[in-house]
């Protein structure tokens, strides 16, 4: 059994990751501001209410943990499209510093296709639409990835394409070669499956694959 801290655990990929981790027999500490609302019941689940931007909360949550899975997300409304966000970079800066202080080395982080060197790799029309709608949000994910890559942590970055609520297929592709990167869709449950598999694997250590359903 591995002790996993999931940050951003109350919904979306984060909630799917908590559920998947529990199914695999791990002890999961589910970190979110609304952790008490997580609709799961398992003896290996520990709810932890906290703010990912507060260093004290994050340091306390790291106590006794072996691995961190960071699954932060934002609601992409009109204001977010126009103004962007600093959530990803601010929370990651707090997390990396806290992990180094607390001696927790393994970080598995969720960003997305379009972050880092996967930007503008979807084809002309896709990239135009993506940059118009998500460009400012992904500018901050670029900073998030840079902070992780620049650290001395044992990191893996997962970059899924467009997320859906379909059931897991377990037939998704993990793509490292930029020549094979393509836009598409992937189930959140499949992304969670990949994230949890990295808890006990170093196959993608210090790599940033694109996940395609």
Language model features: what each stretch is:
Residues 4-24:
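N-terminal Rossmann NAD(P)H-binding glycine-rich loop of SDR-like oxidoreductase domains
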Residues 145-167:
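Conserved beta-loop-beta element that borders a ligand/cofactor-binding pocket
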Residues 27, 35, 78-79, 90-136, ...:
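Conserved Rossmann-fold NAD(P)-dependent oxidoreductase catalytic core, especially the SDR/UDP-sugar
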Residues 31-37, 160-162:
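Short, polar loop motifs at secondary-structure junctions
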């Amino acid at each position: 059994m591995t002790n996993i801290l999931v940050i951003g655990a109350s919904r979306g990929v984060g909630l799917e990751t908590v559920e998947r981790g529990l199914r695999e027999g791990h002890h999961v500490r589910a970190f979110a501001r609304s952790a008490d609302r997580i609709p799961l019941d398992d003896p290996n689940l520990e709810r932890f209410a906290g703010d990912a931007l507060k260093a004290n909360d994050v340091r306390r949550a790291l106590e006794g943990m072996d691995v961190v899975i960071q699954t932060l997300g934002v609601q992409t409304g009109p204001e977010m499209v126009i103004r962007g966000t600093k959530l990803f970079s601010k929370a990651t800066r707090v997390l990396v510093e806290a992990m180094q202080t607390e001696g927790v080395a393994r970080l598995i982080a969720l960003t997305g296709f379009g972050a880092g060197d996967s930007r503008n790799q979807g084809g002309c029309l896709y990239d135009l639409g993506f940059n118009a709608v998500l460009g400012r949000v992904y500018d901050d994910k670029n900073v998030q990835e840079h902070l992780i890559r620049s650290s001395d942590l044992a990191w893996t970055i997962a970059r899924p394409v467009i997320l859906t609520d379909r059931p897991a297929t377990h037939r998704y592709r993990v793509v490292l070669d930029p020549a094979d990167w393509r836009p598409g869709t992937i189930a959140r449950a499949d992304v969670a499956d990949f994230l949890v598999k990295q808890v006990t694997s170093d196959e993608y250590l210090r790599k940033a694959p694109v996940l395609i359903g």
